[in-house]
Structures are given as structure tokens and as C-alpha cells.
């Protein structure tokens, strides 16, 4: 498992409950001021085979069965199109749903890689214990984890979203509300020229699965 290493303060180390245990083994903090320099040369080589995911935290129960089926079929189609790296933000809801399926894909496609882009090490500080447990499991299982800040600050989620888009060649979203972080990320992806597939639109998913452009 690859982690990005840097030093953090003793104060942060003395507060293990503020960040998941996985982020302390080893430390995986990098300041946002160094993101471009550190990652440009290392990630560009895989950008062409990378897909990022963005979606709402709250998923209506009645939409979950159809969304799950589309997720599974779209991920397999993306693999057949040559994509191998899948970048998720590690948040609740759609992010977790995507990451869990990617890990399952890895059991029968050995070259699949799950890359987590975490906005801050304290992302899960106020989550329920059950959600934190799932988050820890994802952190340990991921092939690569990038933590963009040691602490929360206003705008860190948007920084994470831009990082994912900047290191991808395709964006998959679950978007049914015209506001919030998912909408921002989808607009940014389109601005940067990435193909965008919305899992909330069944016809677009079917076109990709059938091998035609979205």
C-alpha cells in the first residue's frame, strides 16, 4: 500500500481519535501547498487510465437498487474501455458505494487500483461508529491513499474534488440535485474537458455499457 508521507505536529499525534488509525500507519499527510509539485510527475503517467467518482452522501432507499446495478455494470464497462485506476473521496454515501465495488472488482481484475483522495485526516471525526469502521476498512484496503490536509479548513472538500478531477480522464457522478459539492465537481470536470457520466441517467449508462460514447 502506498502512502504519501510527511511530518505532522506532536499535538495531532497525541489525538488519535481525531483521525482513523489507518492514517497513522504510516503518516499520510501532505500540505496542499505542495500538491502540484509532489504529484504532477507521479500521477500524470496514470491519468489516462484513471476515473474519479463523485456523488451525494444521501441516497434515497428507493433509488439504491437501480443505482447499484448501474454502478456495477458501468464499472465493468469502464474496465473494458481500458481504465484501471479508480479515485474515490472516501466520504459517506456514494463515495463508499463506489469504493466497495471497486475493491470487489479487484478480486477478479488484479490490475484494478483503488485510490482514495482524502480532504483531511479528520474527515470521519463526527461520523457514527459503524461508518467509521467501514471507512477504516477502505483505508486499509486501498492501493493508494492521499490525504490533502492534516486538518479541516473551509474549502478542503473542494480541493479534494479538484484533485480527483485533475488526476483523471473520466468522471462518474451520481447527481440529482443542482447544488452542492457533487454539482461543483461535475461542472469542474466538464470545464476541464472530462467525459462525464451521471449514474442517475439510465440512458447514458446504457450507452456506455453498449460501447458508445456518452
Model-derived regions, located:
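Short intrinsically disordered terminal tails
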Residues: 1, 211-214
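Acidic/glycine-enriched connector segments
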Residues: 29-211
